[in-house]
Design a protein with these regions (language model features):
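Alpha-helical transmembrane segments and their short interhelical loops
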Residues: 109, 117-197, 283
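Junction motif at the cytosolic side of a transmembrane helix
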Residues: 242-295
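Short, membrane-interfacial amphipathic segments enriched in basic
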Residues: 1-9, 209-216
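Hydrophobic alpha-helical transmembrane segments of multi-pass membrane transport proteins
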Residues: 31, 35, 62-141
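Residue-level recognition of transmembrane alpha-helices
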Residues: 7, 25-26, 74, 93, ...
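Perimembrane loop-to-helix junctions flanking transmembrane segments
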Residues: 47-63
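Transmembrane helix segments
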Residues: 35-44, 173-234
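Hydrophobic alpha-helical transmembrane segments of multi-pass membrane transport/permease proteins
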Residues: 10, 14-48, 66-84, 121, ...
Length: 295
């Protein structure tokens, strides 16, 4: 237990001490913020405004909705991209042959693998909880405060998405052994995941074939969960101003409600998908570390 603690602490400290790696982890969230500041924020504002323009919905409510949508996208992306970057410590140790030194010490392979996994979870949770606090402050400027229940749901959603990101990155990074591979994977994940989870643009804007494909990806439902809970109070407020058919249009346009193969995917189903995926990915990572592949 003491070895696990010290190894986890080592990986975590190394990540935060390396400013380059830390900034790399934040590239995707920064790009997302820039996109929203330059044009996406206006696009979403105009999109919602066009839907509710015939109803008595204040601009403050629309602004709060757009801000909440931005932060839900940012958090959903960060949980995965930051996980990949923080888990690169494991790959870096292999590339620098430091992992051999660690395994020479009286440390089991399982303990070392677990320390990388826990460190990835810890780093990603720290960064995303900080981002969530910033979200609450920004929403507060719109005189909108989330109920405690929704805050707890958001924290649980972040944990689930972080667990998903940590387990997925651990499996992929397990097979990486060089600096070039690190750079390639980081670039692909940073550039691609935002599109795949519907952070850069709503899934409803894609072609039917792409929409269907994305709906089979578990990260899509993690994004939808945090989006639902971050915006739930605003949905309730909008529900008092607009009819049910308009609310349904808002849910469809902003990816908070999905239909898969003709069936509505409820939030309970979304949780089952996310928990089941995390469990399966964690089992695969455990299996890899029990085998004699690579490490």
């Amino acid at each position: 237990m003491k070895q696990l603690y010290h190894l986890t602490l080592r990986h975590t400290v190394l990540f935060f001490k390396d400013k380059g790696r830390f900034l790399t982890a934040l590239i995707t969230p920064i790009v997302l913020i820039v996109l929203y500041m330059t044009f996406l924020g206006t696009v979403y504002h105009d999109s919602l405004d066009s839907i509710v323009k015939y109803f008595n919905v204040s601009q403050k409510t629309i602004d709060a909705f757009v801000n909440g949508y931005l932060f839900s996208s940012l958090l959903a992306v960060s949980c995965v991209t930051v996980s990949f970057c923080s888990n690169m410590i494991m790959v870096q140790d292999k590339a620098d042959h430091k992992i051999k030194d660690l395994l020479i010490a009286p440390v089991s392979k399982t303990t070392l693998a677990l320390s990388y996994f826990i460190s990835t979870l810890l780093i990603t949770m720290i960064i995303n909880i900080t981002a969530l606090l910033a979200c609450f402050i920004v929403l507060g400027t719109s005189h909108f405060v989330l109920p405690v229940k929704d805050i707890l749901y958001c924290l649980f959603d972040i944990f689930l998405l972080t667990l998903f990101g940590a387990s997925l990155s651990s499996i992929i990074n397990y097979f990486l052994i060089t600096q070039g591979q690190i750079s390639a994977v980081s670039s692909v994940v940073s550039a691609g995941y935002g599109f795949l989870c519907g952070a850069y643009m709503p899934i409803s804007q894609f072609t039917p074939a792409v929409r269907t494909f994305i709906k089979f990806l578990p990260g899509t439902y993690g994004t939808s969960l945090i989006r639902n809970h971050l915006l739930r109070s605003l949905f309730l407020k909008l529900g008092t101003k607009v009819p049910a058919n308009v609310m349904n249009e808002i849910h469809q346009n902003f990816d908070t409600s999905f239909k898969l193969m003709g069936h509505t995917v409820t939030q309970s189903m979304m949780y089952l998908i996310m928990i089941g995926t995390c469990f399966l990915l964690t089992l695969i990572y455990i299996f890899l570390n029990q085998s004699k592949i690579n490490m």
